[in-house]
Amino acid sequence: EHYGLSTKGTGDFMRELSAKYGYSDITQFLVEYVSVHPEVDHQVDEEQRIFGKENDNFVLDAHLGFHFVPDSIRICLICDLEEAARRILDDIERTTEDATNISDSIAASQKRRDTMQKNFMCLYQVDINDHSNFDLVLDTTTLSSVEAFERVSAFIDSRNT
């Protein structure tokens, strides 16, 4: 909003696909379906590539955005697994995870992350945990959303001057 940029999130696209394929839980969809149907990853990846070619000045919320839209400011937000799980549970708009407690949410988050890392390494030989792929890596575990935005915004502004 601050920069007036459009936002495209591949997570949103993946959630739409999971519902289309009859899954109410994104982790179950990733583990059971996407792992054995790589064409789903390719669908999402192609959408990223096309979006990057057809648009300028946008935000792409994507694990592999740095790979498919290389001419970009590449920012990675990281967070402690327990805090990330708590945030997922607290997000009332998020309806594609079945976890109802912190332990289940942590387990689902870890399983989802491990599955994505394995799939991306297998498909593209890209390690999503390699921070050298990014211009900025920011640990948001103890930051409010306002504090995280301020730090990211300062970094973006410093790159655009």
Identify the role of each PLM range.
Residues 45, 145-153:
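Short, amphipathic alpha-helical "lid/cap" segments that border enzyme active or binding sites
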Residues 8-69, 82-83, 93-97, 114:
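ATP-dependent small-molecule kinase phosphotransfer cores
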Residues 97-148:
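Small-molecule kinase domains that catalyze NTP-dependent phosphoryl transfer to phosphate-bearing small molecules
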Residues 156-160:
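Short, hydrophobic alpha-helical segments
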